[in-house]
């Protein structure tokens, strides 16, 4: 049976393998194709596509866009939208996601200040040295940094005590509405998918409302299986 993975991250965001290494891993486990869907960036796609072509694997250009959803009973819920088969050279698309990254960078600067004030020395330079200059830094990177420095014992502890929603180091940042992310993906020729709904911890009725809302704006699919490694 030929298998495809439609939700994969590289070191361009919070993955552990470089784009080329992901291709090698995909070939090792027998994947026919995989989608590179890094957070708010397409920086790894060219490298992955080149390696995939040599390996005889289909590389699906993608992205995972972080959004913020509000409804009658839900306020500022972070929702992720995966885009598949996007034109990752589309200039308007690239301009939009660059703005999303700028908002994330502003959040990161505030987070670094909060950690230093709490007696956990950290700097942007140290983060870049550890994870790379071109990496989109996410809360997962801060969790790994905290583990490496001995501030916490695990990534889970970092989120449970400090980085998770409602915790001392959680900073709400500006994000687009999920419907805008769906539209943006479609404008770039892609297919929009609601990522990992099981992680949002909302009621079945609210999830149904979310899906109906996004479908009106062009949502094509819902992620039904998510594997973390």
Regions found by a protein language model. Name each.
Residues 1-3, 12, 16-29, 33:
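N-terminal glycine-/serine-/threonine-rich phosphate-binding loop
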Residues 3-13, 194-198:
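Histidine-centered catalytic micro-motifs
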Residues 23-43, 58-64, 222:
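Divalent metal-dependent hydrolysis catalytic cores, especially in the metallo-beta-lactamase
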Residues 43-52:
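Metal-dependent catalytic neighborhoods of phosphoester/phosphodiester hydrolases
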Residues 53-208, 212:
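Extended substrate/RNA-proximal surfaces in nucleic-acid metabolism proteins
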Residues 210-225:
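Structural recognition of alpha->loop->beta junctions
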Residues 228-229:
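Conserved small/polar residues in nucleotide/adenosyl-binding loops
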């Amino acid at each position: 049976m030929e298998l495809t993975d439609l939700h994969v991250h590289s070191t361009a965001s919070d993955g552990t393998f470089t784009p080329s290494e992901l291709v090698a891993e995909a070939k090792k486990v027998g994947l026919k194709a995989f989608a590179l869907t890094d957070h708010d960036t397409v920086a790894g796609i060219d490298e992955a596509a080149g390696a995939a072509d040599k390996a005889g694997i289909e590389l699906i250009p993608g992205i995972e866009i972080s959004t913020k959803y509000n409804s009658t009973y839900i306020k500022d819920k972070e929702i992720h939208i995966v885009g598949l088969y996007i034109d990752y050279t589309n200039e308007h698309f690239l301009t939009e996601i660059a703005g999303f990254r700028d908002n994330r960078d502003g959040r990161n600067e505030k987070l670094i200040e909060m950690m230093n004030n709490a007696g956990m020395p950290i700097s942007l330079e140290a983060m870049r040295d550890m994870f790379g200059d071109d990496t989109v830094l996410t809360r997962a990177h801060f969790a790994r940094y905290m583990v490496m420095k001995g501030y916490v014992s695990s990534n889970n502890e970092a989120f449970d005590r400090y980085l998770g929603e409602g915790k001392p180091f959680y900073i709400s940042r500006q994000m687009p509405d999920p419907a805008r992310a769906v539209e943006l993906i479609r404008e770039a020729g892609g297919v929009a998918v609601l990522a990992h709904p099981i992680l949002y911890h909302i009621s079945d009725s609210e999830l149904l409302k979310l899906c109906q809302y996004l479908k009106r704006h062009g949502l094509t699919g819902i992620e039904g299986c998510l594997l973390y490694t």
